[in-house]
């Protein structure tokens, strides 16, 4: 039996040590912003921060959910910070970002799940950095009536919401969420604002079967999702769900081939693929692929 405590060579990354990495780290700290890069212990943080790419996490650093895969703190969240949108806009400007990714913790305690706060952040960035494209990675807004409309009206360039895993694992891995609610949210955003690119992702290596992954791929395409990401699940701490399997690069290539036959504008599937990994470059490719589809 394979030793799952030891990560295979294709998972290993270099430790961050560049000047730009530390400059990015200092700016984020000085502006009192949270990032999912740090909170979720992302393996790509060194590469991304060295390129001044970061995914800012709004709505605080404490989540109201307790997903078994996620390293973000869970508990009773703090009050909303009304100045966070302005500080975020300042960070985008100082880092001279061409593309910014904004995510958040789940806020089941808020009436709209934090949708209006996302909208305020988008508005502030548009004021000071009108040429910056904006990608948001949101919670599922479960039972939050009107949240999808607030997000669609805010007009992000990319709307991302991850289904995370296959439906059969939701009870143990993502107990506070509902698979079909996530699909519905993605579909509704596309119906409300067809010009917004939609994106979703999932992890593999949690014990799912390959046919279940293919079914999720089909479901996401049926929901009119444009961009699919698939990456390897990595256990953040011993208190989280264990890795059931390290999926090989060859298996990821197979999943990518399958997904591409379904009609997605873009597919990224690899061991280190994460929702926001290479997001700026991928957005440019996404637009190019869309234009090619229009003329074909």
UniProtKB/Swiss-Prot annotation:
User: One matching Pfam family, short form?
Assistant: Radical_SAM
The EC category is transferase
* Main location group: cytoplasm
Cite the Radical SAM core domain residue spans from the record.
49-265
An example of a Gene Ontology cellular component annotation for this protein is: cytoplasm
Question: How is the cofactor bound, as the UniProt entry phrases it?
Answer: Binds 2 [4Fe-4S] clusters per subunit. One cluster is coordinated with 3 cysteines and an exchangeable S-adenosyl-L-methionine.
Which of this chain's residues are annotated to bind [4Fe-4S] cluster 2?
A: 63, 67, 70
Q: Which UniProt keywords apply?
A: 4Fe-4S, Cytoplasm, Iron, Iron-sulfur, Metal-binding, S-adenosyl-L-methionine, Transferase
Domain of life of the organism encoding this protein = Bacteria
Q: What reaction is this protein's catalytic activity?
A: [[Fe-S] cluster scaffold protein carrying a second [4Fe-4S](2+) cluster] + N(6)-octanoyl-L-lysyl-[protein] + 2 oxidized [2Fe-2S]-[ferredoxin] + 2 S-adenosyl-L-methionine + 4 H(+) = [[Fe-S] cluster scaffold protein] + N(6)-[(R)-dihydrolipoyl]-L-lysyl-[protein] + 4 Fe(3+) + 2 hydrogen sulfide + 2 5'-deoxyadenosine + 2 L-methionine + 2 reduced [2Fe-2S]-[ferredoxin]
Cellular location of this protein? Cytoplasm
Look up the EC number in the record and give it: 2.8.1.8
- Database matches in SMART domains: Elp3
Entries under NCBIfam families matching the protein:
lipA, PRK05481.1, PRK12928.1
PANTHER family documented for this protein? LIPOYL SYNTHASE, LIPOYL SYNTHASE, MITOCHONDRIAL
Q: What is this protein called?
A: Lipoyl synthase
Organism the protein comes from: Rickettsia conorii (strain ATCC VR-613 / Malish 7)
């Amino acid at each position: 039996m394979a030793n799952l405590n030891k990560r295979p060579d294709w998972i290993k990354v270099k430790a961050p040590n560049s000047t730009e990495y530390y400059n990015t780290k200092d700016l984020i700290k000085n502006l009192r912003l949270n990032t999912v890069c740090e909170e979720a212990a992302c393996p790509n943080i060194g590469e991304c921060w060295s390129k001044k790419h970061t995914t800012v996490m709004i709505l605080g650093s404490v989540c109201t959910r307790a997903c078994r895969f996620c390293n973000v703190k869970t508990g009773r969240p703090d009050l909303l910070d009304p100045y966070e949108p302005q500080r975020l806009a300042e960070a985008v400007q100082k880092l001279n970002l061409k593309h910014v990714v904004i995510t958040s913790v789940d806020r089941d305690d808020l009436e709209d799940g934090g949708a209006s706060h996302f909208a305020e952040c988008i508005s502030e960035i548009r004021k000071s950095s009108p040429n910056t494209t904006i990608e948001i990675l949101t919670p599922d807004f479960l039972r939050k009536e009107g949240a999808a409309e607030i997000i669609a009206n805010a007009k992000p360039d990319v709307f991302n919401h991850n289904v995370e895993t296959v439906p059969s694992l939701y009870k143990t891995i993502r107990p506070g969420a509902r698979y079909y609610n996530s699909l519905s949210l993605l579909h509704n955003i596309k119906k409300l604002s067809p010009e917004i690119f939609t994106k979703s992702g999932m992890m593999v290596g949690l014990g799912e079967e390959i046919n279940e992954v293919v079914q999720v791929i089909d479901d996401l395409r049926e929901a009119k999702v444009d961009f699919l990401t698939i990456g390897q699940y990595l256990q953040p701490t011993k208190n989280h769900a264990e890795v059931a399997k390290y999926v090989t690069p060859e298996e990821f290539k197979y999943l990518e081939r399958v997904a591409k036959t379904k009609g997605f504008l873009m597919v990224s599937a690899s061991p280190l693929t994460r929702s926001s990994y290479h997001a700026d470059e991928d957005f440019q490719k996404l637009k190019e692929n869309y234009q090619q589809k229009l003329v074909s």
